Each structure stands twice: as C-alpha cells, then as structure tokens.
Curated annotation (Swiss-Prot):
Catalytic activity: L-glutamyl-tRNA(Gln) + L-glutamine + ATP + H2O = L-glutaminyl-tRNA(Gln) + L-glutamate + ADP + phosphate + H(+); L-aspartyl-tRNA(Asn) + L-glutamine + ATP + H2O = L-asparaginyl-tRNA(Asn) + L-glutamate + ADP + phosphate + 2 H(+)
Family statement: Belongs to the GatB/GatE family. GatB subfamily.
Keywords of the record: ATP-binding, Ligase, Nucleotide-binding, Protein biosynthesis
Organism encoding this protein: Pediococcus pentosaceus (strain ATCC 25745 / CCUG 21536 / LMG 10740 / 183-1w)
Subunit field text: Heterotrimer of A, B and C subunits.
Alphabetized GO MF terms: asparaginyl-tRNA synthase (glutamine-hydrolyzing) activity; ATP binding; glutaminyl-tRNA synthase (glutamine-hydrolyzing) activity
Descriptive protein name: Aspartyl/glutamyl-tRNA(Asn/Gln) amidotransferase subunit B
Organism lineage string: Bacteria, Bacillati, Bacillota, Bacilli, Lactobacillales
Transmembrane segments: none
UniProt KW RNA-binding keyword: no
Enzyme Commission number(s) from the entry: 6.3.5.-
InterPro entries registered for this protein in UniProt: Asn/Gln-tRNA_amidoTrfase_suB/E (IPR017959), Asn/Gln-tRNA_Trfase_suB/E_cat (IPR006075), Asn/Gln_amidotransferase (IPR018027), Asn/Gln_tRNA_amidoTrase-B-like (IPR003789), GatB (IPR004413), GatB_C_1 (IPR042114), GatB_Yqey_C_2 (IPR023168), Gln-tRNA_amidoTrfase_suB_CS (IPR017958)
GO biological process, one term: translation
C-alpha cells in the first residue's frame, strides 16, 4: 500500500525589537534572570499594557515578505491557561484577526519548484522560562515573558521531510532579509512545531496527526519527520490506528519518543483582550511599511546577475543569508571586482567560517579589508598565490595594503626590473634555450621556475612569460 504524507509547520519567530510587545521592558538575550521585567510582565493587577507599534509594523513586513494579505482591522485575544512561566494565567495573541492571511513561499526540491501556502500569521507574546535543578527546586525567569513573537502557520501543502526542510530554509531567508528577526534557532529566536499525518494514496480524508515539539535544528526536523513517516506507515500496514500524540525527537537514537497522548482539543476559552484597543491599518500605513522594506532575495539575485554580471548560481549562493549578501555589497561598494569578490566569499571565506564554526559577524573580516585584497589582486600588486597569505592575515584583522608592504610581498611587475634578470638567466641556461628551439615546452617551465626562485616568488608570472618568450624567440 502506498501512502501520502501531509505536513504542517507552526513556526514561532522572535521579533528584534528594543522593548517587549506590551511593556517597556528591554529585550536582551542572555541577561541575568528576571533582569528585564516590570509589573506588566509580572501580571500585577491594575496595570495596563500598551501595544508596541514596532511589533505591528514588523508583522506587516513579515506579511509582505510572505505574499500575505494584511488584515485591516485587528484585535488581540486572551488565550487562557495556567502554567508557572505565565503569571497572568493567559497569553495575549490574535486568535480571530491574524495580522496576515493566505500567503505563500516558493521552495525547490530536487530541481522542482513548488508554492507552499501560509494559512495565517499572528503576533503574540512569549511566555517565560522554567528551569529545574537536581535539588528539586524549580525557577522561573520572566525575561522572555512579553517578548514579541510572530507565529507563521503553513497550509497542509508540504508532502515530504525534504519539502519541510526547504520550506524552513526559505522562510528563514525571507524573514532574515526583512531585518525583523535574527531567526537563530540556537538562541531561541526561531522555534518549530511540526504536525504530520499519512493516509492511503487516493484517500481525501486526512490521517490522524502526531505533533513533534522541541526540535532544535532544521536537520533534526527533517530526520524526525522521516522517522515519524515510517513509524505511522508501519502502524497502518499492521492494521493498527495512529493515535493523536505529542512526541519529541531524540537526537541520540534518531527516533521520536512519546510525550503524551492527546485526549481531545484543549479549550483555551479565547475572548477579546479588554485592555487593548483594536488596530486599524490603512493604505497610508501599509505604504509607509512597504517603503521601509529592504530588498528581498529574489530582487537581489536578479540585480547581481543583470548589473554585476554574476552567474545565477553565484547570485543564489550569495543571497542564502542577508549577512553574506550585505558583506558582498559592502565589499563591491569599496571598488572590488564583483566576480572575484564572489569567488572569495563562496570559497575561502566560507571555508574559513566552516572551519572556525563561526558566523561572518563573529570574525575580524571586514568588507574594507577584503576589498583592498581583491583590488591588489586585480591590479597585480599581489599574485593569487600571495593572496592566500594575505587572506590569512585579514582573518586576523590585519590591514592588507600595509601588511603586504611590511612583508615585502608586493609583486614585481616592472619590465625594466625583470628584463635584466631574465636575460641573465637565459644566458646562463644555454641547454634550456636549445631545448626550447627543439620544441621542448618544459624548457620554458624550467626557466620560469629559475626566475621565480631568484625573485623569491614575487615576479609577476604574466610579465615574466611575456618577456621570456620575447627573449627566447629573438635567439
């Protein structure tokens, strides 16, 4: 029996704002517990929240980036539940009027493109964080309480673990380019919950879904879905029924593990938030947000190809992350050759980042230093071989122009300086001259090697070859 897989993804993205969604408390990652809180975050009676306009505009940007319709009149709702990290006993969210609806993202898997629909996206506040120690004590940190989130809910269009992975990559890329979030799973600014069900091929009725929670990387999302897909298939092939469960992915075993069985839909008793006014978004506000929108990856790729002469592949690689794309643009703005800059970013720079296991912003590399190095290669101040040493220097924060001069690595390109050396070497190697006359090309390589040896590798190979051939042909 063949089966069809249906996957839905709920992605929570922490918005990069200076203050929280309904209170003036700052938003900072890694501060001391409960350092960034106030009476609104603690849920004191009688205190009134106030909506952060920047959060609403970030939600509008996300909607635009994901081709969604912006809801013109919105209100907030209370989602009622009790948990220690939620002192108010409710979460403020958008149950009935999400900020964006009916969007889509294009993905590509194995050369095939597909649009994945986005059902809705809504802004809401995050909860605090519980921690437990071996002595039996539990602690609550409310620094995260009230941090603004946008939850993005996909339509059931994803049909394989690979498509889920591609969707998450595309979503992260587009949100990152808006600048509204760092979208870093390791810091908790992007979190993913997964729903998966299977049904016999040809059946219109969805199967019973399982939910996977607390997955901390895109790769583990893909692996968890692949395992869960096979687990559910085995159950159905054996004549059993899939139970509605919440499961987690175990990285050590590569399996999903039962957390709890869902007995029924939870009743959160939603009702409109009485302490917050509704929000009306008019055409002027939308236009203002559109004017603030940064250039999206697709437009950047097209510009790199049309204006800078890059290949489609180069443009695609450079726009995988906003960080790399911005670094490329800043380097080219310094006068560096676009193609050579792209080659270094995709080659040496990426290799360095992977080797050091760091992001670009965590290194000592700067667009100014990379541009100086690229320009020295272009104007033949240094050779490509010398550039390897220069690149290592700029990863350590060295200014390349002064470093090259201090190390005596400036390439010799002046014919007036090189010609006497070349003539002397040719005069001292009569056998090589004879070999050249007899059609032995290796003789040229030998003579070039002698010249490079005498100049300690600093002679410009192009100039050397030109003068050498002129000298050999004249004899």
């Amino acid at each position: 029996m063949n089966f069809k897989t249906t996957i839905g993804l709920e992605v929570h993205i922490e918005l990069k704002t200076n203050s929280k969604i309904f209170s003036p408390s700052p938003v900072e990652f890694g501060d001391q517990p409960n350092a960034n809180t106030n009476v609104i975050d603690w849920g004191y009676p009688g205190v009134l929240p106030q909506t952060n306009k920047g959060v609403v505009e970030a939600g509008m940007m996300a909607a635009k980036a994901l081709h969604a319709n912006i809801t013109r009149t919105q209100h907030f709702d209370r989602k009622n539940y009790f948990y220690p990290d939620n002192p108010k006993a409710y979460q403020v969210t958008q149950a009935d009027t999400p900020i964006g609806t009916d969007g889509w993202i294009e993905i590509e898997v194995e050369g095939k493109k597909k649009k994945v629909g986005i059902a809705e996206m809504h802004i809401e506040e995050d909860a605090g964080k519980n921690s437990h120690n071996p002595n039996g004590y539990s602690y609550v940190d409310l620094n995260r309480q009230g941090t603004p989130l946008i939850e993005i809910v996909s339509k059931p269009d994803i049909e394989s673990p690979d498509e889920a992975y591609a969707y998450l990559e595309a979503l992260r890329q587009r949100i990152q380019f808006t600048g509204i979030s760092d979208v870093k799973m390791e810091e908790g600014s992007m979190r993913v919950d997964v729903n998966i069900s299977i049904r016999p091929l040809g059946s219109e009725k969805f199967g019973t879904k399982a939910e996977l929670k607390n997955i901390n990387s895109f790769n583990f999302v893909r692996k968890g879905l692949a395992f869960e897909e096979k687990r559910q298939q085995k159950i159905l092939l054996a004549g059993g029924q899939v139970r509605p469960e919440t499961r987690r992915y175990d990285e050590a075993t590569g399996q999903t593990i039962l957390m709890r069985v869902k007995e029924g839909a939870e009743d959160y008793r939603y009702f409109p938030e009485p302490d917050l006014p509704s929000i009306t978004i008019d055409d002027e506000w939308i236009k203002d947000v559109e004017d603030k929108m940064p250039e999206m990856p697709g437009k950047r790729r097209a510009r790199y190809v049309e204006e800078l002469g890059l290949t489609d592949y180069d443009a695609m690689v450079l726009t995988q992350t906003k960080e790399m794309s911005d670094f490329f643009e800043a380097t080219v703005a310094q006068g560096a050759d676009p193609k050579l800059t792209a080659n270094y970013l995709m080659g040496d720079v990426n290799a360095y980042l992977n080797d050091q296991k760091v992001d670009l912003q965590e290194t000592k590399l700067t667009p100014e230093h990379l541009a100086s190095m690229v320009k020295m290669i272009t104007d033949e101040t240094i050779s490509s071989k010398m550039a390897k040493k220069v690149f290592k220097a700029i990863t350590q924060g060295e200014e390349p122009t002064s470093w090259v001069k201090a190390k005596g690595l400036v390439q010799l390109s002046d014919p007036a300086v090189l010609k006497p050396m070349i003539v002397e070497i040719v005069d001292n190697n009569e056998q090589s001259v004879a070999d050249f006359k007899n059609g032995k090309d290796r003789a040229v390589g030998f003579l070039v090697g002698q010249i490079m040896k005498q100049t300690k590798g600093q002679a410009n190979p192009k100039v050397v070859n030109k003068i050498l051939m002129q000298e050999l042909n004249s004899r």
